[in-house]
Amino acid sequence: MSDKEVLLEVTSDHLNTGLRGVPVGTCRTSFVTPTEGVHYCGYPIAELATFAPEDIIYLLFNKELPTPEQSREIRAELAARATIPGDVESVLKTLPRDGHPMDWLSVGIHTLGMLETTNDWREDAMNLIARMPRLMGLIFRIRDGRADGIPADDPQASLVDRFVN
């Protein structure tokens, strides 16, 4: 494909239909069909809803669903990466409690990035995924005024269990 090849033409008719049927971007891991909706790596999202989040993470990184052994391996890898470096909790405690939750999340993610980055996209992405349940739990509790007595994280628990604990 050349840099000057016309990929599509947009007319005023398209604007009146919400761009239905007009490609607005490309993505190697997902696509949308009018009948089955969103697909990740070729699988309809309705089918993937029955899988554990850890298995979907494996799918997005490897473009295939994991075997039972691979599923155990990614869970172990996420558990090994789960501990948040530094004292993110102290940083979060300095934020205004009435701040927007997305601003809190942004500060938390940026703090994690400042405390530890490998400059390898896969390593950094896996670290962030593994640490998100704890980060979200800290944000919810601290914003809600329940910063005292936050239970320790259990990295061996599933991502969902860590998030709701």
Feature locations, PLM:
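Hydrophobic alpha-helical bundle cores within soluble ligand-binding/oligomerization subdomains
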Residues: 1-165
